Amino acid sequence: LANQKGGVGKTTTAINLATALAAIGERVLIVDLDPQGNASTGLGISRTDREVSSYDLLVGEATVAEAAIMTSVPNVAIVPSTMDLLGVELTIAEHGDRAFKLRNAFKQLGDLTINEKPVSYILIDCPPSLNLLTVNSLVAADAVLVPLQCEFFALEGLSQLLQTIEQIRSTLNPRLSIQGVVMTMFDKRNNLSEQVLHDVRSEMGSLVYDTVIPRNVRLSEAPSYGKPALLYDLKCAGSQAYLRLATEVIRRERQLNAA
């Protein structure tokens, strides 16, 4: 999940999409690559429980199996983030394989099981910038999911992200595709939300998911309780939207694999 703009619902989407995928039978690993560690906090992982983190993964001091922690969400594990990530670029900058650190770590993924079964989805929560952490994510990923808020300037910066994705695809990861664009923070009472949604769909076409994530109080409240919205209030509009998004993601992935 990538977007160099902050505040677009990226971490909220990572947490709740993972939970929704798990609810329909998938086994999901989240890799928190944002030094702020909001995905880790939002899943109830305290700072003291992050003895091994995504930093250790990138510098080669831990395997995915060693870094992953089971969360309170059934079938969801996370490789948590710490503030150490702020210095990881300096640590690996001189390494010839600096863009491939995460991909190399994933080569040992077979060691990790969730409830004795292999992981079926890995969701990488990228930082809100196009830095080496995001490049590592794009090099390691099969596809990119782009959260975009239904607010003015939503498309600002998107062209730069799409250009970066194309550069990664042409040089470092030819299998990389765009899974889709998910519109977040949609307010049906607001004409601007409708206009932005229309503009983005006109610009991006079928890449935009049918599911739109509403602006929802429960989605905002849930992280302060260390829970995804689906565990905090399953019936709220936000939770139901993420369940629909999960089914769309699975359907699109099957279409991409069949292509």
Can you describe what each PLM-predicted range is?
Residues 1-259:
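P-loop NTP-binding core
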